[in-house]
Design a protein with these regions (language model features):
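Internal, active-site/partner-interface "lid" segment
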Residues: 93-138
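Glycine-rich phosphate-binding loop
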Residues: 25-60
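Glycine-rich phosphate/diphosphate-binding loop of Rossmann-like nucleotide-binding domains
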Residues: 1-13, 17
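Conserved active-site and cofactor/substrate-binding residues in soluble primary-metabolism enzymes
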Residues: 4, 25-29, 39, 74-85, ...
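N-terminal glycine-rich FAD/FM-binding segment characteristic of electron-transfer flavoproteins
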Residues: 19, 30, 137-139
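Ser/Thr/Gly-rich flexible loops in soluble cytosolic domains mediating phosphotransfer, phosphorylation
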Residues: 61-101
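Short beta->alpha junction loops
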Residues: 19-25
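Short coil/turn connectors at secondary-structure junctions
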Residues: 14, 38-41, 133-134
Length: 139
């Protein structure tokens, strides 16, 4: 997933960095914090369950650029398109809409797992802990 987001960003000629946001588990606020820390003013937030948001620093936290909430249905090409769109926003270009799948049975099928992941993620939230830049290596 991260490799595809990186590829989408790099295809647009931009750089990236990873930052862990500790203060909240709300993906909109995570993405907004990422955007505020970003040199371009655009950030991507990803929850452990896969829900992903593209945000811009001058927007209100709950007024994001794009929200991808069908996490179990987001495939690798979609994550690549998310990276590409975030880079296009950063370059002040108009991105193409990211095609999303819709499956009415995905929510009931994955809701319990998603809730458990979110509960676990929320347990690690620490309002007083500052964001931390991460170095991620792929092997």
């Amino acid at each position: 997933m991260l490799k595809e987001i990186i590829a989408g960003i790099e295809e647009e000629g931009l750089n990236y960095r990873f930052v862990k946001i500790y203060r909240t588990s709300d993906v909109c606020f995570v993405a907004h914090d990422a955007a505020e820390l970003s040199g371009s003013g655009v950030g991507i937030g990803i929850q452990s369950k896969g829900t992903t948001v593209i945000h811009q620093k001058d927007l209100f936290p709950l007024s994001n650029l794009e929200l991808f909430s069908q996490a179990p249905l987001i495939d690798l090409p979609t994550f690549r398109a998310i990276g590409k769109n975030a880079a296009k926003y950063a370059k002040n270009e108009s991105p193409a809409p990211v095609p999303v799948k819709n499956d009415q049975m995905a929510r009931p099928k994955y809701q319990a797992i998603a809730a458990l992941l979110h509960i676990k993620e929320t347990e690690y939230a620490d309002r007083n802990k500052k964001p931390q830049e991460l170095k991620i290596e792929f092997k």
